[in-house]
């Protein structure tokens, strides 16, 4: 409804540090919502697309995307050359963002309240919620002002809480968190084997990059100003929209022509070999989509089968990495250890989702897996069940939505009519005024007692109200030399038009 049409296909962005399981879960969620997910792309990569369109330059440019949002933090280093984007390295923290800065403020004021009033705010969830809302507002204000005040009436046990905080105090409270954002920046540069002096542009993305201290830390580290020309809240969505246009074949915009996007695997992917060793097939920061094969053999004589265990992570031992899935390849003919040739292939698609296969070259026996057994992942059967449920209850859901729409329409019409009459700007007789007011009161009273009525009952009530109100209101507007506001007829036509487009 927001876009005025049906949305079938989507490009969905995820934090660069999302693992395989989280990416698949995101794709599953899109499928359940009725979307054909064309591509899952990293948020910093999406921001880079937006940046690439804004800044067309000759030659290769190294761009660092610093994305600090409400709950996650991502840093990516990209090269952009002649419309080709390549992610060289990524790093970050999935649990750092604006909420953590809010928490520091909340804790600070909880302690202040305890000092002043000898009361513990943490025992009251509502008081904490009100304080958190005020803290978030204060944090935003401190991005443009040197100090701000917090005023909350009757915060806890009837006590009003009036206080203030300076930007300097806020920066001190969050000092370790702010400085901690530099570590992933250094790691990204190390991984990409690029010196900070070789970074041509720094792009700030995410609402939390509006904090002046964050901007200063970044500019001091690189000894140059960060690029803030892109709206930090819109950059990712802008880039995703451009990618969607490319994937759907829309080349109507000159900007979307000749752009090639190369994403990377955020973590190394490999299998367990003898002794619990992690043997990577796809190294971290490999450009995707990619396909890698490697040949392995048996560990003992006459071994009838092998267990292929797939892991992601950077640790040398598999026990320290994340198990994605496993499967067995059986039917290997008896042979001395080291003789059978088992080819393992990792096929990682553009969405970061992987198919793993293994085949024994001598017999041609093979087996494969699309990783599905991780906790964060839905099986095909579960997805089908959820889709079936959505289809099963579709008619009921639509009927309920239609009923609520009729109820809201009647309520809005009655109250707007009441407000128009109360303002007293229209000339009408006392009898006419009383007639409408009585009917409005009757309708409002009926609404209060019939919150679960059927759609046709609401429509019937609205027709009754219109039958009385419309002639009187038209006469009143005519006398005032104006036109009455468009009431239900136009609104209903508009709704029907939208519904036809949606179908």
Swiss-Prot record:
Low complexity composition-biased segments: 475-488
Family statement: Belongs to the heat shock protein 70 family.
Location of the region described as Disordered in the Swiss-Prot/TrEMBL record: 475-503
Signal peptide range: none
Highest taxon above the source species: Eukaryota
UniProt entry keywords in alphabetical sequence: Allergen, ATP-binding, Chaperone, Nucleotide-binding, Stress response
A Pfam family this chain is assigned to: HSP70
Protein name: Heat shock 70 kDa protein
Molecular functions (GO terms): ATP binding; ATP-dependent protein folding chaperone
